[in-house]
Amino acid sequence: MRHWLRLIKYSLLHEIAKYKAEPWMPNIFTQKLLSPIFLIGCGRSGTTIMGKILSEHPNISYLFEPYHLWAAVDPRTDILNLYSIIDADLLMNESHYSWESQMRFNRLFLYGHKNKNILLEKTPLNAMRIGYLNALAPEAKFIHIVRDGIDVSLSIDRLASTNSYKIAGKPQFNQWWGVQNYKWTALSRDGAAAGYYPDEINQLQDNQGKGAYEWLVTLGEIERWREFLGNRLYEITYNQMTGNPAETLRNICQFLQVDISSNWIEKATKTILPARSTLGNTLQLPSGMCASFNLHQTQFNFPNRAIPL
């Protein structure tokens, strides 16, 4: 029954989004449009818990992984092929921008948030679409959460291998990699085209290695845009979030320029559990990926290390 309900939910949300994206909606130029905040990071890095906490702030309107809205803005964003079988793009930049997608983005994302000062959108893989997002919202800010790469790759491995999330009519749907593993097809294609270890991708044969590659490409895109974004980018580690949540939330509020509520922070910190020790977990990667992976681990003071294949 659940897999049928999911099919109905995804189809209905997408059709409503497409309807709202059309020009017959209210004139957006007479409305107050919010500058968005994008919460990004490789999946399984803590964006969900951070998004949930920030969503409870009275000044913040929150959109949780609105794939249906993005697919209505531009079908090429449908990297899981949730709504149609399409040759979607994972890495997206300003070349994907169009005036039509700008208008659809404004209608679906920026309009209609009554009594809110901030729009927070959380789709982790948007870390690989910063150029596209910047074209749509040149004043947008970004919050990036980064977590130990081995922890991330193991979490992706568990999710992709267990694959318990089913959708009716999509027998070849994988919870992490999408229909017929299309997300991996796009990641390996777009990652290679962007120069991310093109000669080593074919050596990745399991979900943990592929998850580590997604982590590497995500961090590579963050580094590529770091200087350009400047003070529009705020970065935290998963360990900072779990080890000192109160200070982390205060700093984020200052970055977002929203009020700091002691009651909200006290309530929020109770929902964040300390990170579990994962020292000793292993990961094997091709030599080039392995070297870059361990450099990032050192950069963020993560203890685990990959070893070369």
Annotated model-derived regions:
Residues 1-37, 165-175, 179-309:
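PAPS-dependent sulfotransferases, especially Golgi type II membrane carbohydrate sulfotransferases
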Residues 1-106, 113, 162-166, 171-173, ...:
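PAPS-dependent sulfotransferase catalytic core
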Residues 39-41, 119-122, 144-146, 235-238, ...:
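Short beta-strand segments
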Residues 57, 137, 230:
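Acidic-histidine catalytic/liganding microenvironments
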Residues 60, 140, 232-233:
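Short, conserved active-site loop motifs that form the nucleotide-linked donor/cofactor pocket
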Residues 104-130:
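Glycine-rich phosphate-binding loop used to anchor ATP phosphates in small-molecule kinases
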Residues 122, 133-159, 252:
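Conserved phosphate-donor/acceptor-positioning beta-strand/loop module used by diverse small-molecule
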